[in-house]
């Protein structure tokens, strides 16, 4: 049986974030649990033009075995401003972070034009976060993925010179 491959590695400077420290509600499995959710954006090139977003849904302070969760600590340091970002502190003062993640789908129904449609947005989902002293010298190794997939359909798009689209 073939093992499914779904790994991404994002390595670069912390660009910005929208992380929040939250607490689970009274109807959750573990009420009152503090957790972090939101997005972290990483600039993977020296020119700060290739920004990759990683989404965290639910990161708690401890792992399922009760040990301290290192990723929670890194994300908490980002929230607390202990780790600088390009937007807040400039590129030279931004933390260098590596995130080992996976590609996931954020599927939901949306009411568009009076008709409910399934929306499937692809995103980097969570993963281990580690603070480093410097990013990989080779920019091509900073944003990598290793996935297997099945292509279920394709479509031909006609060339459009106005939009600079080849056939």
Q: Model segments located where?
A:
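OB-fold and OB-like single-stranded nucleic-acid-recognition modules
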Residues: 1-167
């Amino acid at each position: 049986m073939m093992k499914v491959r779904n790994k991404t590695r994002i390595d670069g400077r912390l660009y910005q974030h929208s992380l929040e420290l939250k607490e689970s509600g009274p109807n959750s499995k573990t009420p009152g649990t503090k957790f972090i959710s939101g997005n972290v954006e990483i600039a993977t090139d020296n020119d700060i033009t290739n920004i990759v977003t990683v989404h965290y849904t639910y990161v708690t302070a401890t792992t399922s075995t009760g040990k301290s969760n290192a990723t929670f600590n890194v994300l908490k340091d980002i929230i607390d401003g202990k780790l600088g970002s390009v937007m807040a502190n400039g590129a030279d003062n931004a933390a260098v972070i590596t995130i080992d993640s996976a590609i996931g789908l954020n599927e939901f129904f949306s009411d568009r034009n009076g008709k409910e449609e399934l929306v499937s947005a692809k995103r980097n989902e969570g993963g281990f976060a580690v603070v480093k002293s410097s990013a990989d010298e080779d920019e091509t190794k900073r944003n990598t993925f290793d996935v297997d997939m099945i292509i279920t359909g394709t479509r031909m798009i006609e060339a459009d010179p106005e939009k600079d689209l080849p056939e």
